[in-house]
Every structure is written in C-alpha cells, then in structure tokens.
Design a protein with these regions (language model features):
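Non-catalytic interaction/targeting regions
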Residues: 1-93, 97-113, 130-134, 154, ...
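Acidic/glycine-rich beta-solenoid
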Residues: 77-78, 96-99, 116-151, 156-173, ...
Length: 558
C-alpha cells in the first residue's frame, strides 16, 4: 500500500504517498489539509537527498556514502552549510552559509576537549575520571576556569566559578535535587512527594511556597508563603480551562483539535481565535471587539495582516529573510543583508525623510559599527549622520564603544565578563566592588560611594550614599513584594491585593502624609480614584480600554 490517508477529529485529511519496500519504505509526497504538497527524495538506501516545500523550493542534502551522516545542506537560495566528522562519526567542523566555522576536538576516549566558536572563542574541557564523560573543569576564552564535581550517579555536587566561589547541590536517593547552597549564606530547599513531584520550595528565611497536583500530575495550586492560592483547573485532556487567583478567574475554551478558541477575562469579556486547517492563527477578536486577521504563504510565513482596515504586507527574500514591510501600500521599513546573510541596513520613512541604521561587522561576525543617517525626502542628500564604533579585547569580550566626536567609553571586566568599572577616555567614571555572588556591594563614582546590602533571601536591603539624605532601606513581605522604602526625608509604604496588584501608596514625611489608592477592575484596569470620585459607579472596563480618568478623556481609533 503506497497511499495512507490520515483524518483527524476536525475531518482534516492528510495523504502520505510512499515508495520502497519494508525497511526502505519512505514518504516521498505529502498532501496537506490545505491542498499544498511537499515532496522528499531519497537515495537507494533510504537516505534523505532533497525536500521540496509547498512553494516548490528545494533543499538538498548530501549524506556521506559510508556513514550516512549529512555532509552538506544547500538551501533554495544556493547557500550551503558543510559538516565534517572524525572516524568515530563525531562532528569536528561545521561551516555555515556565512563562511564562519565551528570546530571541535576530542580525546582518545571520544570526549569533547575543545570547541572553537565561529567568532574564534575557545572553550576547553578537562576530565579527571577516565570512566566519566562529565567534565571536571571548563576554561573559556577569557581564561576563566570553572570546576565541577559529580556523584557516581552523574549528579552535580558542586560548581566553583571563575573567582573560586562555590555552589553546592544536595540530592535525595532518587536523584532529585533537594537543596542548593550558594555563597553569602543563600540556600534553597526543595521537597517532593512519593511520585517525585515538587511540593515545596523554601528559602533561607523559611519562606515556603507549596505546590499541589491532581491525580493526573497537573499542577492545580500554588500556595504562596502568606497562604494565598493560585489555582488551575483542567479538562479531561489535561488542558488548563480555568485559573483563579485572589477570587478572580480567567478561563479558556478549546476546539476538538486542542486549540484555544476563546479566552474569558476576569471582567467576563472575551477574546476569540480562529485557525486555518494547518493550525495557523488567522483571526483574533480582542476584548475590545477589534478584529485582526492574518494570512500566510504556502510555507507558513506571515505575508499579510489586517487590523480593522489597516493592511500590512510582509515581503521576504529567497532565504526567507524579511526585506520590507508595507502599510496601506506604502513602504514602512526595509531590511538589507550582505552576501553572508548579516543585517547591514534597516530603514523607515519619518515625515518624508528616510531614516536608516547601517551595521558593520568584522570577519568573526561581531558588530564593529553602527551608523545612523537621515536623508532629504526629494534629493536623498545626507542631512545628518552619527556613527558609533565597537571594539573587543583580546579575549573577545566587547570592551569599548566610540561615539562620534566623543572619547571612547571603555568598561573593565573580570572573570567571564563581570563589570568592574567604566571610564570615559582616560577619565575613570565608576568602579564596582562585588560580593561572592558577584552582586554589586560598592559603587565609587567621583567623590561619592554607594554601598548596597542584601537580605538573607537575596533581596535588596539598603543603599547608603555618603550623602546621608540619599540613603534608602527596603522592606519586603513574605511573598517577596516590596512594601516599604525608607529614607531620611520620607517613607513610602506599598500595599497589594490578594492577586499581587498594587492597591495603594502611603507617603509620609515631616510635613506630609499622603495616601494614593490604586483601584482596578477584576482584569487589572485602573478605575477612578474612589476617594477623589466617591460617586463613581464604574466597576470595570469590559473592553479593556480606559475611557477616562481623573484628568483626561481617552478616544481610540478602530
């Protein structure tokens, strides 16, 4: 039988045409539900040689005669990628259409010991156990070394970063991670049920988030440290149909193919979705009643979108790269690429002027310059330009930016690229001191110093400047929400609803005591201030469009 018909629950049909016998039977033609056809060609031993898409474009594959491994891929635009292997069939080199090469080296046991990225960066791998494929150390292009230790079961036990700081991992007898211990006393603990499902996560301060599941293993509830619940209900097929948080519910409906066709917000308003026979979104009608339509070509690319009469067309080159976009028949943006496929220009029209950004790269594909230009509407004469150049250090890290007519801005890094300082020309701008987690603890700029401290849970605790009036202390609740910012001049307190939305800000100072409430409808849209407008009867914006507030009226186009 050389023809197979597949019919799904929506009565959509796909037809597969096959050739060959027994183990060499292959699908050589596929008729899709929309009538489009794709084809495949195979050699005498069943290896893929070519694929032709629905638009008639062919991609060619060249397998090795002996191993069958792909050695070359040629895309419809004629550009090719090449792949090379050693006698163990391991990839040793790959060259992309842009000519850049990835290289890999292996030891006598077949383990990866060095990888050279297309931009020339080299990563090395070291092993201390001849019976393990897990590396004990890596060294990146900057020379920074990281080490790892593993259990005999292949579980990561510790990771030491480039500065010698250690993160340790604990596991239970089933191999599940039960704790992570980081520098600066930060730890996280995890608990599991008898089915191996995560049921609790606790931080160093004892704040615990719990998780509940149904019998099918779907996550049904997340209980925050303060006891508030975020629940999810599922249908018989395991798809989420309802989520509830703080008494507010959002629901989803699906068609027989499992696609979302209706989303109902907390306000009770709806967004609906329609799809074509290939499951591509073709229409969306939002909460506000606005309808957007989408059209695709035979290969699935978006080529036309309609937004209440505003028609946009999308155009591509042979490599499927976006080349220009038109709105109401007028060109809105253009994209240009060089022979390597790298983006070189992007432009648009603003008040008749052509505004563009031009990009330059080095031979490794790294951005070396970007030039902004503005041209005259009629003569195309250059009216204005500004160029910024980019430079890299010997390790390949970006470390210098040179704007037009200004000294270079240079940043100093350590390890694998952590920022340690910046300077303008030869003038130091700022220096950073970091803790064992590489978080900023001291910033020095001019005659000022900003000291930063963190809570045991890793949240920002305080920022103190040597100008005392600028000091700030931060307070958080058990759920990790910011509830207070205190400074010598004033204090601001924040309150939240059970859904986590900001409900009010209370500012106090020597001669100041202001409360600003933030009222929202169930979907989170701002409502009129209940204190300033006590007579307001508005309880929601059903279409998610705010029509007025205390100061303004808002009008929308189609």
């Amino acid at each position: 039988k050389d023809r197979i018909t597949i019919t799904d629950s929506l009565d959509r049909r796909e037809v597969l045409h096959t050739q060959g016998e027994a183990g060499l039977k292959r699908v050589v033609k596929k008729e899709h539900a929309d009538g489009s056809v794709t084809q495949s060609q195979f050699d005498a031993v069943g290896r893929l040689r070519a694929q032709t898409d629905a638009a008639g474009r062919t991609t060619e594959y060249s397998p090795d005669v002996v191993t069958g491994l792909i050695t070359r891929i040629t895309t419809p635009d004629g550009r090719a990628s090449a792949f090379y292997y050693n006698h163990h069939n391991q990839l040793t080199s790959a060259t992309g259409p842009d000519g850049l090469e990835l290289r890999r080296e292996y030891d006598e046991l077949g383990r990866l010991i060095q990888e050279t990225a297309p931009d020339g960066d080299i990563t090395r791998y070291r092993y201390d156990n001849p019976h393990s494929d897990l590396p004990c150390a890596t060294e990146d292009a900057t020379g920074s070394r990281k080490t790892m230790t593993w259990s005999r079961y292949g579980q990561l036990l510790s990771f030491t970063d480039c500065s010698g700081y250690v993160t340790r991992y604990d596991h239970d007898r089933f191999g599940q991670m039960t704790a992570v211990h980081r520098e600066e006393g930060l730890s996280q603990y995890r608990a599991y049920d008898s089915r191996g499902q995560l049921i609790a996560v606790k931080d160093t301060q004892g704040h615990e988030t719990r998780y509940e599941y149904n019998i099918a293993g779907d996550l049904t509830a997340v209980i925050a440290p303060d006891g508030s619940r975020n629940g999810t209900q599922y249908d018989a097929w395991g798809k989420a149909v309802r989520t509830t948080q703080g008494g507010l519910t959002r629901s989803m409906e699906y068609d027989a193919a499992g696609r979302v066709i209706r989303l109902t917000s907390e306000n009770g308003s709806h967004t609906t979705f329609r799809y074509d026979v290939l499951d591509r979104l073709i229409q969306e009608t939002g909460f506000d009643g606005r309808t957007q339509r989408y059209h695709h070509d035979l290969t699935g690319k978006l080529i036309r979108s309609e937004d209440e009469g505003l028609v946009t067309h999308w155009h591509y080159d042979e490599a499927d790269r976006l080349t220009h976009r038109t709105v109401k028949g007028e060109t809105a943006e253009r994209w240009q690429y060089d022979e390597r496929g790298w983006l070189t220009d992007i432009s648009h029209i603003s008040e008749g002027h052509r505004v563009a950004v031009h990009y330059r790269y080095d031979e490794k594909g790294r951005l070396t310059g970007e030039r902004q230009t503005v041209h005259h509407p009629q003569t195309e004469a250059l009216l204005w330009q500004h160029e910024t150049r980019h430079a890299y250090n010997a390790q390949g890290l970006a470390n210098r930016c040179i704007p037009d007519s200004l000294p270079a801005v240079e940043w100093l890094t350590y390890g694998s690229g952590y920022l340690a300082g910046m300077k303008l020309g030869d003038t130091p701008l700022v220096e950073y001191t970091r803790d064992r987690l590489h978080r900023e603890t001291l910033r020095s700029f001019g005659r000022y110093e900003l000291t930063t401290a963190y809570t045991p849970a890793g949240q920002l605790q305080s920022q103190h400047l040597n100008s005392l009036l600028s000091d700030r202390d931060y307070t958080w609740n058990d759920n990790g929400e910011l509830i207070r910012i205190s400074s010598p001049r004033q204090t601001r307190s924040y309150s939240y609803s059970t859904t986590g939305r900001l409900t009010g800000v209370h500012t106090t100072a020597a001669n100041l005591d202001i409360r600003i409430p933030y009222a929202t409808d169930p979907a989170g849209n701002r409502l009129p201030d209940p204190e300033l407008h006590p007579d307001s009867t508005l309880s929601m914006w059903p279409d998610n469009r705010i029509a007025r507030d205390a100061h303004y009226l808002y009008r929308y186009d189609r």
